[in-house]
């Protein structure tokens, strides 16, 4: 039997595009055998397995202008542009509850991509319980420059998109025969280099992350070109915006 895998790129609030696609999947009872998400792709993607249609768009519309949820207020107060307590505790547990039991009952392997701060390498961590592994999901979406690294055990992690923005090759290596890849960038998008001055300043504290950031545009653009070959050859179906989504992104 063919094994179908789903890959979700990050992209901060461009992830609303992903949320809409996932809601359409739920409407049409489209199921996957394995799922991997990066950054916002991981944070929003778990709602697909919990079957909570509309939740991602609903809570982001409700809270994204709340100064306690995200923005300079939590950045100055705790060093994270997205509040750890408000966004990762209050919202999913009380204000707009996430159904962790339904998520676990889906029995679909879900992986969040994180970047190891010490090595600069990607790691793919299976999420068995969203509430028990919230720090892993938080790490996957912890953007450099505006987030503190997240400690998990004796290691520290940042945004998975630093090291592997579109992990389609990794998921194919998990015995998936056919992939659906949701991108948050349009067909013509190619990533540009980051400011080397800014990255080198960041590299004083996180040298391996800085190395990745300096090469990220090359790695991302190579991945996009390879994915287009997979798409043309029928190995992957790619769902992407038809035109640019104009939302600020730091990486």
PLM features per residue range, with description:
Residues 1-38, 46-251:
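Patatin-like phospholipase
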């Amino acid at each position: 039997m063919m094994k179908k895998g789903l890959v979700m790129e990050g992209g901060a609030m461009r992830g609303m595009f992903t949320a809409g696609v996932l809601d359409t999947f739920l409407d049409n009872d489209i199921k996957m055998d394995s799922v991997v998400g990066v950054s916002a792709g991981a944070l929003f993607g778990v709602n697909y397995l919990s079957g909570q249609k509309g939740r991602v768009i609903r809570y982001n519309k409700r809270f994204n202008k709340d100064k306690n949820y995200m923005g300079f207020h939590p950045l100055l107060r705790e060093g994270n542009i997205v509040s750890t307590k408000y966004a990762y505790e209050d919202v999913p547990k009380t204000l707009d509850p996430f159904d962790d039991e339904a998520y676990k009952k889906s029995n679909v392997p879900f992986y969040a991509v994180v970047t190891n701060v010490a090595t600069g390498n990607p790691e793919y961590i299976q999420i068995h319980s969203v509430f028990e592994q919230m720090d892993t999901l938080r790490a996957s979406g912890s953007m450099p420059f505006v987030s503190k690294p997240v400690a998990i055990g004796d290691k520290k992690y940042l945004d998975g998109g630093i090291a592997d923005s579109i992990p389609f090759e990794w998921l194919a290596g998990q015995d998936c025969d056919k992939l659906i890849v949701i991108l948050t960038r349009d067909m013509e998008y190619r990533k540009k280099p980051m400011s080397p001055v800014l990255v080198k300043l960041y590299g004083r504290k996180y040298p391996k992350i800085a190395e990745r950031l300096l090469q990220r545009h090359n790695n991302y653009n190579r991945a996009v070109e390879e994915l287009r070959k997979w798409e043309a050859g029928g190995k992957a179906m790619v769902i992407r915006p038809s035109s640019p989504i104009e939302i600020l992104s730091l990486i």
